[in-house]
Amino acid sequence: DLIAGKVLRIDGDGNAHPGNKFKGDKRVYTYGHRNVQGIAFRPSDGRAFTAEHGPWHNDEITALVNGGNGGWDPAEKRGGRSACPDKYCGYEPNQKEGMTPAVRAAYTPMSDTRFKDLMPPAWNNNGYSQGTGSAAFLKGKKWGIYEGRMVAGIMGIGFGGTPSGLRID
């Protein structure tokens, strides 16, 4: 019954949108999220995208699908992890010495591909940043060739420098 890790789609009175497909709480639009920082709606079609903190500098942008699963599963004894406190590995220290971005991403993957209803990320930082911020779509002619593109803030620089030139078309 918790709403943690979920994106809700409700009306102004807090009632569930009648088109939501989640089988449990009818207010739920998507589930399986770790730490959503922002939701932006693409102007061309109104589709919702989330900017989300992943573990170990493994952040994602995801196009939401009604009833879809974000894929977050912080289970222990996967990806090289041993037993974790309270059987939850989502908040282990994220600065392991000598771990490359790829090894960190495999250690606690943001999107667990075992889920058949997984919403695959539209973008993943591959372990190179430290926390996505809010997101927005650029609107107006002043943006030139970038009009209609999505931007997301990065709250810190991770290992290997800043990812540059990455975008969602």
Where are these predicted regions, by residue range?
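Beta-propeller domain segments
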Residues: D1-D169
